[in-house]
Structure formats: structure tokens, C-alpha cells
């Protein structure tokens, strides 16, 4: 899948910030000059962190490439700021103390596994984001999450189950579907400051 250039990644982060600012101010934000890649369907997540402590402040996204990237980014950035049920809505003035991180996702692919041990072999911490499905339960963790928490593969899978509202050993004891994806990450180092691509 075609990756974003660094300039396109910067555009995504800046767009997300302005989009949130406009939404919180009651202003409709429209972009006229759009890089072509933003018209292609992509999955995307917007993650907000407090600055400088870098505590999670909101994270919502659209994992599947079901709409043009610009539309997914518009929806995810607003949702991360006001619709994450774990946090109160972000205030307009508070946004000055928040950094924005954008993850552009590859389409999720089913991890083929004949036994739970196969997951330990096929999933790579730091490369793979994961989605687990079991019945009506579904949970997702971005690839940067286990790195931030220093999890090994077993801890990663256990926490993936917890994210879905399942017991930690569901991936071992039940017939689940686990999907993997990769992400290209662009983030601010400080609020409205320098933007970098995370390698």
C-alpha cells in the first residue's frame, strides 16, 4: 500500500488540529487544495496526549479503509477529542496543551493460526497492530501501544483481550479471529509544534 510522504503526514497532523479547533469553535473547516492520497480510502486513528506528561487524552479511529482518508481523518480527529467515553470532551483552550498523533493504517489481515502458539510466531511486537474478534466482542490496539507499555507478545495479546472486554486468556482458550495491520505514524513533539514521523 502506498505510504504517505513526510509532507503528506505533516498535512494530516495539521489538518487534524485545525479540524478539532474549528469544531470546538463551532466553525466548519473545508480544505480546497487536497493531496491526492487523501482522496483514497484508508483506515486512520487520531490519538491525543497531554503535554508535557504525555498521558492519553483520547484515541478513536476508523480501522477499515471504508472512506476517503480525509473524511476518516475528519471524523476520527473530532471523535477523539469529544467522543472517547474514557474521557470528558476536550475544551477549546485545553487543546493548547495537547499533542496530536495520527496513525495511517494498512488494511487489517487475518492472522492464520492453527493453534494459539502460531500467534506467538506470526505477530511481531512493534510492527503489528491487532484486532481481536470473538462473537460480538471486538478490541483493537495500535502497534505503538505495546512498545509504550513494554509488553511482550503474551502481554500484548492479554491486553488486547481486555480491550475487547474479554478475559485475558481468551486468545488461548477460545476460537478467536485476530487481525494484524501496520501503521505509519506522524506526531507533534509539542502542541502545534514540530511534526515528526515515528520510525
Curated annotation (Swiss-Prot):
Pfam families in the cross-refs: AMMECR1
InterPro entries: AMMECR1, AMMECR1_dom_sf, AMMECR1_domain, AMMECR1_N, AmmeMemoSam_A, Uncharacterised_MJ0810
Domain annotation AMMECR1: ranges: 7-197
Gene3D superfamilies noted in UniProt: Hypothetical protein ph0010, domain 1 (3.30.700.20), Hypothetical protein ph0010, domain 2 (3.30.1490.150)
SUPFAM superfamilies for the chain: AMMECR1-like (SSF143447)
PANTHER family, alphabetized: AMME SYNDROME CANDIDATE GENE 1 PROTEIN, AMMECR1 HOMOLOG
Name of this chain's protein: Protein Maeo_0138
Natural source organism: Methanococcus aeolicus (strain ATCC BAA-1280 / DSM 17508 / OCM 812 / Nankai-3)
Amino acid at each position: 500500500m502506498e505510504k504517505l510522504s513526510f509532507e503528506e503526514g505533516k498535512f494530516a497532523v495539521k489538518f487534524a488540529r485545525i479540524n478539532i479547533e474549528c469544531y470546538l469553535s463551532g466553525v466548519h473547516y473545508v480544505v480546497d487544495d487536497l493531496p491526492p492520497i487523501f482522496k483514497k480510502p484508508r483506515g486512520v486513528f487520531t490519538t491525543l496526549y497531554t503535554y508535557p506528561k504525555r498521558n492519553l487524552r483520547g484515541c478513536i479511529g476508523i480501522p477499515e479503509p471504508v472512506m476517503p482518508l480525509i473524511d476518516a481523518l475528519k471524523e476520527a480527529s473530532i471523535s477523539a477529542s469529544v467522543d472517547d467515553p474514557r474521557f470528558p470532551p476536550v475544551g477549546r483552550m485545553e487543546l493548547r496543551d495537547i499533542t496530536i498523533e495520527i496513525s495511517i493504517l494498512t488494511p487489517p489481515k487475518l492472522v492464520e493460526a492453527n493453534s494459539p502458539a502460531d500467534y506467538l510466531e506470526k505477530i511481531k511486537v512493534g510492527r503489528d497492530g491487532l484486532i481481536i474478534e470473538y462473537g460480538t466482542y471486538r478490541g483493537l490496539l495500535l502497534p505503538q501501544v505495546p512498545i509504550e507499555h513494554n509488553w511482550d507478545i503474551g502481554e500484548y495479546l492479554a491486553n488486547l483481550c481486555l480491550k475487547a472486554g474479554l478475559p485475558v486468556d481468551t486468545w488461548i482458550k477460545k476460537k478467536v479471529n485476530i487481525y494484524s495491520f501496520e501503521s505509519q505514524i506522524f506526531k507533534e513533539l509539542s502542541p502545534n509544534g514540530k511534526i515528526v514521523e515515528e520510525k
